[in-house]
């Protein structure tokens, strides 16, 4: 059982993906609170907007590690979500700071349901990725 760069990449990806899962869970909880009217949109957007860039950068960093170690299947598994993140950030509402969520439009029914659905889909993708990364780590440790 040898430790190599691929195993290190999968270990870092597991830790990073755990953070991404927590980001997605927070995203779902935050929009559910908005849907049930537990919090006002200004406070909720002020707590969600600072987490957008760290989530996107962490996901991009993990995939750069996969690119450097030549794990093409893991990279291809994440390319659609990277493309969606880039598209979503380029088409964000015009605001003074970084972030995606505008307090004036976040309570619209279609925007709220789209953001909630986005959170659930991201949570599913990150969970599937987490278990695949466990498999990849074990496989890379055993195969060498």
Curated annotation (Swiss-Prot):
Subcellular location field: Endoplasmic reticulum membrane
The keyword Transport appears for this protein: yes
Membrane topology listed for this record: Multi-pass membrane protein
GO BP terms, alphabetized: anterior/posterior pattern specification; blastoderm segmentation; dorsal appendage formation; endoplasmic reticulum to Golgi vesicle-mediated transport; oocyte dorsal/ventral axis specification; protein transport
Annotated spans, Interaction with grk: 1-57
Lumenal side stretches: 1-10, 78-122
Topology, Cytoplasmic side: 32-56, 144
Keywords associated with the record: Developmental protein, Endoplasmic reticulum, ER-Golgi transport, Membrane, Protein transport, Receptor, Transmembrane, Transmembrane helix, Transport
Transmembrane segments: 11-31, 57-77, 123-143
Superkingdom, natural source: Eukaryota
GO annotations of cellular component type: endoplasmic reticulum membrane
Similarity comment text for this entry: Belongs to the cornichon family.
Complex formation: Interacts with grk.
Name of this protein: Protein cornichon
Native species: Drosophila virilis (Fruit fly)
């Amino acid at each position: 059982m040898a430790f190599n760069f691929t195993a290190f990449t999968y270990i870092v990806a597991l830790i990073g993906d755990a953070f991404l899962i927590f980001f997605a869970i927070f995203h779902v909880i935050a929009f559910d609170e908005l849907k049930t009217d537990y919090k006002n949109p200004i406070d909720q957007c002020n707590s969600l907007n600072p987490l957008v860039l760290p989530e996107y950068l962490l996901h991009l960093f993990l995939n750069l590690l996969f690119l450097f170690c030549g794990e093409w299947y893991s990279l291809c598994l994440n390319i659609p979500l990277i493309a969606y993140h880039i598209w979503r950030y380029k088409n964000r509402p015009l605001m003074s700071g970084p972030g995606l969520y505008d307090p004036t439009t976040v309570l619209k029914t279609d925007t709220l349901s789209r953001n909630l659905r986005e959170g659930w889909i991201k949570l599913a993708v990150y969970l599937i990725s987490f278990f695949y990364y466990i498999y990849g780590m074990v496989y890379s440790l055993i195969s060498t």
